[in-house]
Each structure stands twice: as structure tokens, then as C-alpha cells.
Amino acid sequence: MVGVKKLQVEEWTLLIDIPKTKDVYEKIKYRNDMVEWLNYMEVCSFQDPQVLAFFENLGIDILKPSQLSYYPVEEGTMMIYTGSYHLCAEIVEGQMDGWDLVIAGHCFSLTQEHNAIPQEMSGNILEISFEVVLPWLLDLSIPAK
């Protein structure tokens, strides 16, 4: 299996098809112009190097979450972002329900919901859900929910 690599993430071993995952993310062309999404994209350009390396090691484009929700906090100066990304992979060792990982304030979990899987993705698919509180960087005010 060319391009498939074993990756150790704490006590879990994942078998990831990096080229296939990257190819799927390259094909995703959607763009969302809601200001909450635009702020997420802006903040991602200044992400912690550990977070960026985590996504790069999985073959995921951090700017293209499969699903993204957001809630203003701290009087509109911060946003709680939750969502998911998908990758062409499977768990080789470790329990699905025990996979919780915190990297630079980002909480990641493997989930079984498999919501909003990119159409181009097939085969073994893992969903990584996340939650993070990020600053509001745009010069626009946060829309009321």
C-alpha cells in the first residue's frame, strides 16, 4: 500500500493513507463566506506549530473542516469552534472511545458519527472531532446567534 503510513498518537496506532487523504482535501473546493468561518480561516493561519504539524501528519487541510459550528463567548472577543475532519485511515491499536487528545488548547476525539464526510472520500474513514476556543480576529463584529 503505497503512501500508507503507521502513525503513533499517544497509545493509539493509526494506519493512514496520507496521499489519498491529501488528494481528497485538494479536491474540496467549497468556500463559506459566513464571518464565523472567515474568522476560523484567519485564526488558522496563525495556529500553533504543534497543531499545524498534527494536521499535516494526518494529511488534513486545516482550512477545510467537514463540519464547523461556532458560539461567541467572553463578550464577543472569543469563539468556541467545534467541528470535524475526516481522513482515510483505520485504528490498528487502541480503543475508539478512549481517544482524547489535547494539543495547544485544541481538544480532539475520534468519533463514530461520521457526519458530513466529503463525497470524494471512500474506504476506511476516521472522523476527528474538535473543540477549541479561539480569538475573534476580524474587524467585523460577531453576528448575534
Residue ranges and their predicted role:
Residues 9, 16-17, 89, 103, ...:
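Generic detector of low-complexity/intrinsically disordered segments
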Residues 35, 88, 129-131:
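Residues in well-ordered beta-strands of folded domains
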Residues 30-80:
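Short, well-structured hydrophobic secondary-structure segments
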Residues 111-145:
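Glycine-rich, aromatic-bearing surface loops/beta-hairpins
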Residues 12, 39, 90-94, 133-137:
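Generic structural motif
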Residues 62-124:
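Amphipathic protein-protein interaction modules
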Residues 2-45:
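Long, hydrophobic N-terminal alpha-helical segment
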